Amino acid sequence: MNQLRLALLATMLAAAACSQPPVATTHSVTIMTFNVENLFDNIDDPGKDDRDYLPLSQKQDPEHKAACAAVEVESWRNRCLNIDWTDAIIAKKLEVIAQAILQVDGGRGPDIIALQEVENIAILERLRTEYLAAANYLPGVLIEGRDTRGIDVAFLTRLPLAGEPQLHDIVFDESFNAREGDTRGILQTDFQLPDGSVLSGFSVHFPAPYHPTEMRIAAYRTLNRLLVELPEDRPVFAAGDFNTTSMEDSARDMLNRFVRPDWTVSNDLCVGCQGSSYYAADDTWSFLDMILWRPCCGEDATWQVRADSVQIANGTKAQMLPGGTPRRFSLPDGNGVSDHWPVVLTIESK
């Protein structure tokens, strides 16, 4: 009798299980963009103008002083002559960058980080292995570009790569040839999402605001051409320092013309956020740093931005001045982190 009852119970449980709909598996991926402001080692890279970021002991020869004296901007000239970029200062810089990254996702850090102003793969790998070891990031992605100072765009990721990264030069008008040495390419990297599909990402650092607006327009157009070349059924993001100030956007309608027609813009979803960068000279905030999102397939998209997930990651003590603005990394004390705050968003499968 007991065996009969057990058999009936097993049959009923099996039938009940079959009648229940399968439980949906939801995956999420957190993306950060972070301009880490001059993350240099203190070794002179051949072919790059990185003389600012050397120890003071290596800045005493006449050749170095003569090169610095030729710099027209006084603050840049003083930086070239007087910054003492020691091992201890580099260690402090790496430490505070890591703290800013690890404040996200309960100390794990984001799954993907688009980085700007990284000198080379060596300093990126030092950040990853010595200061972000707990985050379990894979070897960094950085391809040396044409910026004469040597600052590059890069990625750190826990997601496996789904192809060979590529660095795309921005196509400028010939009238800007003399300025190309102060520009960075667009780094494309494809990632394998948890459900096995491919996510394409671009890490960008557009021409600085002191360059003509037309150079940033050229950068947006290059990015959008790269977007069109990707499969329509692939989710895509672009993250970085777009260097479009709030004043320029207001005057030239930059985001409405070159971004919103194709992308969802992170700052449109960041409730109550003033910006990621502050310019004290005219007391203005800007979202220089953005994450742009292009889901695939319209309403049938399997990956979407999670509601209310966009945030400014500025919660570490070192990141903020008493007045509530970004605290750039300053010498000689090594206070601050960067003149940019990281922007974070989460995408999830449905």
Per-segment meaning from a language model:
Residues 7-16:
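Bacterial N-terminal signal peptides
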Residues 18-130, 141-146, 151, 319-321, ...:
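N-terminal, active-site-proximal structural segment of metallo-dependent hydrolase catalytic domains
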Residues 19-23, 30, 225-237, 244-350:
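Metal-dependent phosphoester-hydrolase catalytic domains
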Residues 31-36, 80-86, 90, 101-124, ...:
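Active-site beta-strand/loop signature of hydrolases that rely on acidic residues for catalysis
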Residues 42-47, 125-129, 152, 166-169, ...:
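Short, solvent-exposed loop/turn and secondary-structure capping segments
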Residues 48-50, 113, 131, 140-144, ...:
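Extracytoplasmic, non-cytosolic globular domains
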Residues 81, 160-165, 297-301:
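Short helix-loop capping/hinge motifs at secondary-structure junctions, enriched
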Residues 112-198:
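Structured beta-strand-rich core segments of catalytic domains in phosphoester-bond hydrolases
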